[in-house]
Amino acid sequence: MLNYNHTIKEEKSYQGLQMIEMKPVMKLIVRGKKREFLSAIGKSLNMVLPTKANTSTQSEKLTALWLSPDEWMIFSNGVVKENTNSYDTETLLNKNISKLDLGAVVDVTDQFVRINLKGDKIYNLFQTGSPFNFNDFKNKIGSVTQTILAKIDVIIHNQNKNEVNLFVRRSFSEHLFAWMND
């Protein structure tokens, strides 16, 4: 059973910036190159994986982030039950992808923390700790980047205007959250 420990204990709000850990959210990494892999994902999840670099696709229940030409992160849009390690999406993909040797499916729910940031000061915060140029990124809804923030590897997903999802490894999440609150 999932022993989910919240790394970020509270929601933080400042003028122009709000930060909260979205908990718990199912997160999977899927990898594959074959056309059959992409087709099986589409049929299984009723969504198409993004094939253009640094983009995302979204359905009612799931979002897929492009990480590399053969790697995507799929996460649930809503919270999942904390009393289980079993996710219907993972079970379905294991059956239709892994067992047919079309690709790999890895549960990274416990590995990554998802922090939702809202407000018009998000990119001011990011620019103080990242070498990435956010000028074009912030105007493209659904764009994705993997970058460094305060010397920590992160995945940033531009959800909406002035709203982003930031994925960080659990072991670095408290440090990053403290840096963002400083």
Regions found by a protein language model. Name each.
Residues 1-182:
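Basic, glycine/lysine-rich polyanion-binding surfaces/domains
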